[in-house]
């Protein structure tokens, strides 16, 4: 592996001997104007890796869409009807229309807004799921745009998120 194949953020971690999900010893100054939804914000003066490990918060989700028989779902036309979510401490299901025992919403817009608020509340370090990078993330982003919903699941206040599309290649899976 060559230096130009390692992202700048990863290079910073390597050069500063920072191990993600470790405990850290830091010197900070409090921020006067908050820019995130985090509990506290600080300007970092210095950092050193300490001992121990912090388990990352993971949120796994999957969507189901209403589709036409024999066709693949199209986010420009077919609504999301269910979003199932799972964390280590809870599971949640957002459903379009009345579904006993689950969080039900009269419109897709209301359901997607509730899901985005949930993602912000959970504030996951890792957002995962089956095929989310090749389907679910883009589908939700497209539906939000179509319905006029700000796609906000960032920790940054006022930041409208966007899905970054990347192409990968391996001998096993080919180009994706």
Briefly describe each language-model feature range.
Residues 1-176:
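The two-metal-ion catalytic cores of nucleic-acid processing enzymes
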């Amino acid at each position: 592996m060559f230096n130009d194949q390692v992202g700048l953020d990863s290079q910073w971690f390597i050069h500063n001997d920072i191990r993600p999900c470790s405990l850290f010893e830091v010197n900070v100054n409090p921020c006067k104007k908050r820019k995130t939804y985090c509990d506290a914000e600080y300007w970092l003066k210095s950092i050193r890796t300490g001992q121990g490990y912090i388990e990352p918060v993971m949120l796994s989700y999957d969507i189901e869409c209403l589709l036409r028989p024999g066709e693949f779902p199209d986010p420009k036309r077919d609504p999301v009807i269910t979003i199932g979510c799972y964390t280590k401490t809870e599971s949640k299901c957002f459903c379009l229309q009345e579904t006993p025992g689950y969080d039900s919403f009269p419109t897709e817009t209301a359901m997607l807004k509730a899901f985005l608020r949930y993602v912000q509340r959970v504030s996951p370090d890792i957002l995962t799921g089956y095929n989310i990078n090749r389907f679910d993330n883009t589908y939700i982003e497209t539906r939000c745009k179509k319905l006029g919903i700000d796609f906000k699941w960032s920790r940054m206040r006022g930041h409208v998120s966007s899905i970054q599309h990347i192409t990968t290649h391996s001998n096993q899976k080919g180009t994706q």
